[in-house]
Structure formats: structure tokens, C-alpha cells
């Protein structure tokens, strides 16, 4: 039974808490709530990932996924899976502020390249495909194609938002980026 541990970046509370699909992002963090809605697995947010993992294990989880956890070396691991943006790669290979890396590259057991051609030797390929929009107030899902030809206000709070904006444009939306 899998469980997810996360720091819960952006949440207002700093107390450890469990997150589910009904959780408020202010309490659990944006990403943990989205993960909960998508997976329905137990999620624990805590600045101390070891404590969060112990909590989930006590709840019956036998596989722990640490969201954005490669830099948290205090959490023991059996397998490291690194997901990277194949368009940007590792940039110049340097650490911030001279480059894009938050920490030195370390060996990973599995590398997965988002947008990577499938013929690469050192990594698996994956491709994200946007198909639906989620209405933040009502929770309603709509096919992205329902907005073809319309002008949309697109807001992104991610490190490389251009891929998101480009994907919307590829679906025929006129995008005003924010």
C-alpha cells in the first residue's frame, strides 16, 4: 500500500497533518492536495519527512513516495526515481545561482525524462498530455478542447511555465500568460 510524504510547500500551517482529496490547500499544500485527488493514497505533510514516513508506515503503508525528496538525504531510500524536464535537461550543470540545479547531481536508480524521445539509453521517456481543465471553485472537469478558439487567462506557479502555456496554445487556445 503506497503513501506519499511531502513538505507541503506553500501551506500556512506548519504542523504535521494528513491530506486527502477534501483537504484545503492552505492546510496541506497545493501539490499534496492535487496528488490526493488524483491517487486517493494516504499523504502526510511534515517538514520532517522521516517522521511523516514513520506515520504512514504505522498506518499500513509499505511503499513511501517522497514528493520532491531527492535532496532530503536523511530519509533512507531503497530506490531513487528522478523525473526531469528533457527540454531543459540539467542546463549548464551548475548549482543556483550560476545554474538551474538546487543540489549537485547524484546517481539515481531510474531517470524519467518528461518529453524525452523514447530511444534514449539512460532514461525512460514520459509525455504529459493535457486533456482536461479543473474549475477551482466548483471542481467541475471540462475537456480542454471545449475552449478551442477562446482566449484564456493562464496562471502558472511552476518553475518552467512555458511548457504549460505552449500546451494550451497547441490545443487551440489563445493564451494570455500570467
Each predicted region: which residue ranges?
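Walker A/P-loop phosphate-binding motif and the immediately C-terminal alpha-helix
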Residues: 1-7
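Short hydrophobic segments within beta-strands
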Residues: 5, 83, 154-155
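Phosphate/Mg2+-binding loops and adjacent switch elements
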Residues: 8-122, 132
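C-terminal accessory "lid"/substrate-recognition subdomains
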Residues: 90-178
Amino acid at each position: 500500500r503506497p503513501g506519499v510524504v511531502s513538505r507541503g510547500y506553500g501551506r500556512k500551517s506548519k504542523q504535521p497533518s494528513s491530506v486527502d482529496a477534501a483537504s484545503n490547500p492552505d492546510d496541506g499544500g497545493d501539490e499534496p492536495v492535487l496528488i490526493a485527488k488524483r491517487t486517493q493514497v494516504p499523504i502526510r505533510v511534515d517538514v520532517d519527512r522521516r517522521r511523516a514516513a514513520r506515520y504512514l508506515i504505522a498506518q499500513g503503508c509499505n511503499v513511501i513516495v517522497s514528493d520532491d525528496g531527492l535532496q532530503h538525504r536523511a530519509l533512507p531510500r531503497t530506490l531513487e526515481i528522478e523525473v526531469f524536464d528533457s527540454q531543459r535537461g540539467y542546463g549548464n550543470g551548475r548549482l543556483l545561482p550560476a545554474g538551474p540545479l538546487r543540489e549537485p547531481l547524484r546517481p539515481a536508480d531510474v531517470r524519467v525524462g518528461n518529453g524525452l524521445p523514447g530511444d534514449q539509453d539512460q532514461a525512460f521517456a514520459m509525455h504529459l498530455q493535457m486533456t482536461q481543465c479543473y474549475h477551482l471553485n466548483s471542481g467541475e472537469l471540462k475537456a480542454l478542447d471545449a475552449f478551442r478558439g477562446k482566449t484564456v487567462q493562464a496562471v502558472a506557479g511552476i518553475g518552467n511555465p512555458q511548457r504549460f502555456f505552449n500546451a494550451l496554445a497547441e490545443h487551440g487556445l489563445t493564451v494570455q500568460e500570467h
